[in-house]
Amino acid sequence: MSTARLKINLDALAINWRNLDAKTNCETAAVVKANGYGLESGRVGKALAQAGARNFFVAIAEEGIALRRALGPGPGISVFAGHMEGDAKLLRDFQLTPMLNSLDQMLRHFESLPGHPFGVQLDSGMNRLGMEAAEWMAVRDIALDQNPVLLMSHLACSDEPGHGMNAYQLKNFIEMTEGLNIPRSLAATGGLLLGRDYHFDLCRPGIGLYGGAPYADALPVVELEVPVIQVRDLAPGESVGYGNTWIAQRDSKIATIAGGYADGLHRAFQRQGIMAYAGGTPCPVVGRISMDLITVDVTDLAEVPPYLSLMNETQTVDVLANAADTIGYEVLTSLGNRYARTYSA
């Protein structure tokens, strides 16, 4: 079998949610956008619901369909993108709650789905989504008359606890919402870890659930094992892969494994170098990562196993991300469709 195995530990996912929830004195929701950060939103959502999550967030209305089918009619599912043109039927049929981002969305929602639950997203300084303070003040009374279920905003720099932007956005959010008897939410994973001043009524962790930074105590949720297709011997001076970027300095043994950038194993991982693991033994990935293949120096192994591990407790999502000068979010959500996904609980 030449398919790589992506092992997803749903117990670790649930423990991460419970441990984050224990840091708050408010409700803890769960963000399962981008198909559950690449791990399949239905499976992830069910595990988180069993752990205790009662509210979930997705990016766009279409993502809510599979999640609602998996969760059934009870839990809340909110949509960050709000109420886009053509969304009314999806929002109604799948009981999705849009986080309205603008006056246009507000008018669209009130006209097409009167009485349907909604929240409002406010821009506290990130300048990405949400109503700015002046726009909010102009329509606030209209919105409040329709009974929003949540007022929310999003932090730009919460992964940097000492960044002044955090306090600035907190101040702005308080000024925009103070005195209103509506549940509020500001914190994702990073904001939750900043402390209870940022928690309000609901926290909505995402990446921390899946084992990623900035939640340093997160349990790893994913393991990736890639099958060995072929092993060959090289003499000193022979090269490996495109561009001859790696040249053997000694008698070497090279394993070619069945994964590549088409599977989300980016060429950029080679900027700082990554390892493939045979049990606990690291073996350097050498040469360029190509679309479907990766080459590994297994010279020092007594025996080459049928699979080598690229993601595990040692080489985590964030270790891979750092090697490519990116973030764990990008690594997780890039994991391709060719993997055989298995789930343990």
Swiss-Prot record:
GO annotation, cellular component aspect: cytosol
Domain of life: Bacteria
Matches recorded under SMART domains: Ala_racemase_C (SM01005)
N6-(pyridoxal phosphate)lysine, modified sites: K33
EC identifiers of the protein: 5.1.1.1
UniProt gene name: alr
BP GO terms, sorted: D-alanine biosynthetic process
Catalytic activity: L-alanine = D-alanine
Enzyme class: isomerase
Name of one Pfam family that matches: Ala_racemase_C
Cofactor(s) required, per the database record: pyridoxal 5'-phosphate
Protein name as annotated: Alanine racemase
Keywords (A to Z) from UniProt: Isomerase, Pyridoxal phosphate
UniProt: substrate binding residues: R128, M291
GO molecular function: alanine racemase activity; pyridoxal phosphate binding
Active site residues of this protein: K33, Y242
NCBIfam families (alphabetical): alr
Pathway annotation from the record: Amino-acid biosynthesis; D-alanine biosynthesis; D-alanine from L-alanine: step 1/1
Gene3D superfamilies, alphabetized: Alanine racemase, Lyase, Ornithine Decarboxylase, Chain A, domain 1
Family: Belongs to the alanine racemase family.
